[in-house]
Amino acid sequence: YKNLMEHGRVNTKSGHGNPGLSSTTVRSVHLMLHSAFERAVKERLISRNPTDDCIAPKVQKVEMKTLRPEHLKSYLDAADARGVLPMFYLELVSGLRKGELVALLWDDLDIQNRTISVSKQYIKNPSGKLTLSRPKTETSVRKVSVPQEAVDLLIQEHEKHPDSPYMFPSSTTGEMYYPDSVVKLHEKILRD
C-alpha cells in the first residue's frame, strides 16, 4: 500500500501537490478488495484471501486550522481591502461550504427573516467542469440564519451589481466565482 500512498494518483494535475493517495482512500480500496476476495473464497473461486496478509493504513486525522478570534478583525479588514468582505463575512458566520457560497443567488436571501436558503452547490466534475448540484446530503438542504450585519453587507453588495443574479459575482468577469477561486482568495487574505 505504500506505493499507492506515494504514487497512486492517476491525475496529478488535479491541483493536489501530492501524487499519492490519502490513507483514507487506500484503506477504502483495501476494504473493497478484502470484501471481494472474501466473497470469492466463499464461492470457492480461490482458496484464500490474498488481502489477509495486508495491513491497511490507519486513517490519518488531519487537524483543522481555524481562525483564532484575535485574528478575526484583521482577516475581515483584509477581505474588505480586496472588495470581498460580504462573501467572507457570510462564510464565517454561516459555515457555508465554498460550493454552496458561490452558488447563492439573490433569491436565496430572505431579508425579513434574515435567512439564506441553501439548496444547491457548484462542484467540479471529473472532467474539471463546474456543475450545479444539490448539496452532499439531504440535511445539507437547509435555511441558515444570519446576523443583521451580514444582511446589511449583502444588501450593500447587491447595490453594486443589481442586475446580476449571483450573490457574489466576480469583479473581473461578472459571473460567479469558481469554488477554487474562493479558496485562493481566502489564502491571499490570510497572507495580507
Each PLM stretch: what is its role?
Residues 10-14, 18-23, 27-29, 42, ...:
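Basic, Lys/Arg- and aromatic-enriched nucleic-acid-binding interface segment
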Residues 33-37, 95, 101, 186-187:
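Short, basic/aromatic-rich helical patch in the C-terminal catalytic core of site-specific tyrosine
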Residues 1-19, 36-38, 42, 191:
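Basic/aromatic-enriched alpha-helical hairpins
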Residues 1-6, 50, 174-175:
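A Lys/Arg-rich helix-loop hairpin that forms a DNA/phosphate-binding surface
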Residues 70, 113, 121-127, 147-192:
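Active-site/catalytic core of tyrosine-dependent DNA strand-transfer enzymes
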Residues 120-139:
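Short, flexible, glycine-rich and Lys/Arg-enriched loop motifs at helix boundaries
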Residues 117, 143-145:
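Generic structural detector for well-ordered beta-strands
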